[in-house]
């Protein structure tokens, strides 16, 4: 979506609460009385040194429901409340579903959440705890989306990648990164990449900051996919997706397609970024290595550490400002017994 706004003054921002709503002018909700919030946003940006590189971890997994999804959900459900909608349907691999269930509970909106049957039990339990109706689909992530779309013919479809309000909320991560770095853009931003919501939102946010003269360059945006399910990598590398993909422990990014595929690839290309793939073994090692640094994240988030190692082989990262998003809590993941 496109709307005009003037980014808030830096001195004014210092007076505002540390949530996504500090950037109120940039969020397309007409009235404050419709805002649905758990004070999400302004997640910690933690300086670390990894393999001789100074970098920052953006701890999105400390959000109210344990994932980056809360940013987009706050704006999406605020808009739903503003429109007077009382029932919604949503599909998810788990994190977005849990987030939507929580914010719908706060807004007193009835939610029906579709997830793959093989989704983590912890995520499914979280959705049910908030009072949403959980519908399990025996199929992959794309089949789950189709089932939700069929069910949403007579109600509101609150899907994260389709809905522009979700993107508008998630773009605030870009704003925070720049503000937390002293109003300077990083050189690289890395995040897990599934359906592409985070990548698209980062692109939107950084582009708005550049267009308003707040930063003078776009960071290189790097998406990390699981080798077993990597349609964006294949398209970025060769121009073609495979006909079929396998399963991955990183369930949150197990998407074989995206409804905004070309738009998301364009974000990577515009930023002169790239897409990286990592193996299942590398993901397991990433979980352990991150936990030994004090970061307890789910497998979907852990792809970024081996992704960083691979990026180092192809780019000179010395003296570069690197920000890496840790997007989902390890508490959401059920380890196989």
Annotate the PLM regions.
Residues 1-337:
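PLP-dependent amino-acid enzyme catalytic core
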């Amino acid at each position: 979506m496109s709307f005009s706004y003037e980014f808030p003054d830096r001195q004014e921002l210092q007076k505002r609460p540390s949530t996504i709503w500090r950037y109120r002018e940039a969020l397309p909700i007409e009235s404050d009385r419709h805002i649905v919030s758990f004070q999400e946003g302004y997640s910690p940006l933690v300086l670390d040194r990894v393999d001789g590189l100074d970098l920052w971890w953006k701890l999105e997994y400390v959000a109210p429901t344990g994932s980056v999804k809360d940013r987009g959900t706050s704006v999406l459900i605020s808009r739903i409340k503003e429109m007077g909608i009382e029932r919604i349907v949503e599909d998810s691999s788990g994190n977005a579903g849990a987030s939507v269930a929580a914010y719908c509970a706060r807004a007193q909106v009835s939610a029906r959440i579709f997830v793959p049957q093989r989704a983590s039990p912890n995520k499914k339990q979280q959705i049910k705890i908030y009072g949403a109706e959980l519908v399990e689909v025996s199929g992959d992530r794309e089949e789950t989306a189709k089932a939700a779309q069929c069910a949403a013919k007579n109600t509101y479809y609150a899907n994260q990648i389709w809905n522009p309000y979700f993107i508008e909320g998630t773009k605030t991560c870009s704003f925070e990164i720049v503000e937390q770095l002293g109003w300077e853009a990083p050189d690289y931003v890395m995040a897990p990449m599934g359906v592409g919501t985070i990548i698209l939102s980062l692109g939107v946010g950084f582009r708005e900051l550049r267009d308003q003269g707040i930063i003078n360059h776009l960071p290189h945006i790097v998406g990390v996919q699981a080798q077993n399910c990597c349609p964006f990598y294949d398209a970025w590398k060769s121009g073609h997706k495979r006909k079929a993909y396998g399963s991955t422990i990183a369930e949150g990014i197990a998407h074989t397609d995206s409804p905004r595929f070309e738009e998301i690839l364009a974000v990577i290309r515009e930023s002169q970024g790239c897409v990286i793939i990592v193996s299942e073994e590398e993901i397991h090692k990433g979980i352990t290595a991150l936990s030994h640094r004090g970061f307890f994240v789910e497998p979907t988030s852990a792809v970024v550490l081996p992704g960083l190692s691979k990026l180092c082989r192809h780019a000179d990262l010395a003296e570069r400002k690197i920000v890496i998003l840790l997007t989902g809590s390890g508490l959401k993941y059920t380890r196989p017994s």
